Amino acid sequence: MRQEKDAGKGGKNMRVYNFSAGPAVLPEEVLMEAAAEMLDYKGTGMSVMEMSHRSKAYQNIIDEAEADLRELMQIPDNYKVLFLQGGSSQQFAMIPMNLMKNGVADYIITGQWARKAWQEAKLYGKANAIASSEDATYSYIPNCADLPISEDADYVYICENNTIYGTKFWQLPNTKGKALVSDVSSCFLSEPVDVSQYGVIYGGVQKNIGPAGVVIAIIREDLISDECLPGTPTMLKYKTHADNGSMYNTPPAYGIYICGKVFKWLKAQGGLAAMKAYNEKKAKILYDFLDESKLFKGTVVKKDRSLMNVPFITGNQDLDAKFVKEAEAAGFVNLKGHRSVGGMRASIYNAMPMEGVEKLVAFMKEFEENNI
């Protein structure tokens, strides 16, 4: 079920349907544009990979990327957009280093990444786990309507979409006036959001926006200051990057360039509202099949299902392994579940075409008929 694409000059490329959780599928239009500009970006005679980040040409690239992101997300003027490095995992430390003024924070534990963030925060202050879904292998989102928010908490932390377990916060927690910090790595730009409800929104781009190596952090300005925890390195202060337009040091220049192209692609698709509608249709195809299947079943409470990451199992580990192997041979790759949970997982990010999900479901139906 591989997609044969014209590679130019009579050549053909065989493209697979890539269901990887990250790094993940990117829009083909973006990849083709980048390929066309690889040796000569807009008459500069060089690749963006070779370009000085201090050049006017590159300044235009990063400025345009930020402007397009602000337009897509309708980011208020009192929020800074930072293009950072270090992966989302580095934010597990940067957040408490920069925000723990009272030395207290509340965490909602809905998966491995929220748990790791909580464990890291405990190195810097009192980090409270105020709700968790660990009791059911993170298969649901806890009720967050009336949480025991700490009176002196500096912030409340969530991982909004849980890549491994396939759950999503469809309603933000009531933080009782405390700043909400949200890791949106695997749902970034998949739907409209009201940025003003957050203190910090951040995420690694390698799932839904661009290549690995870039982290985007959107931070309310009142949370950015020199008053960080004692000993916070210069490079781990948000103010360092905010004061220098994300170019205190050399940024992940090529990654930001690709992100900028994805922002333009999203605008051409109709923006985030159109993207959410498209993602809902894709996810419905897969979830409807799982709900009716006699072999496969989903692992998440229905009301908390993610549109981006869909875990499923057969209930037999050998059969799971057989499915993953045969799917890969048919051109459906990276369907193996996270090493910590097993089973399968289809990550159907923005750039996954409807056709990819439809053909995956057709393959699953055929596999079911042959193995039930």
PLM feature segments, named:
Residues 13-16, 329, 342-372:
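PLP-dependent enzyme catalytic core of the Aspartate aminotransferase-like
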Residues 45-91, 98, 112, 120:
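Conserved N-terminal alpha-helix of the aminotransferase class I/II PLP-enzyme fold
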Residues 89-156:
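PLP-dependent aminotransferase-like
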Residues 181, 195-206, 215:
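Conserved active-site segment immediately N-terminal to the catalytic lysine
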Residues 15-66:
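A glycine-/small-polar-enriched, mobile loop at the entrance of the PLP active site in fold-type I
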Residues 22, 121, 132-188:
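Active-site phosphate-binding strand-loop segment of PLP-dependent enzymes
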Residues 296-327:
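Conserved PLP-binding catalytic core of the aspartate aminotransferase-like
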Residues 27, 205-287, 301, 370-372:
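Active-site C-terminal subdomain of aminotransferase-like
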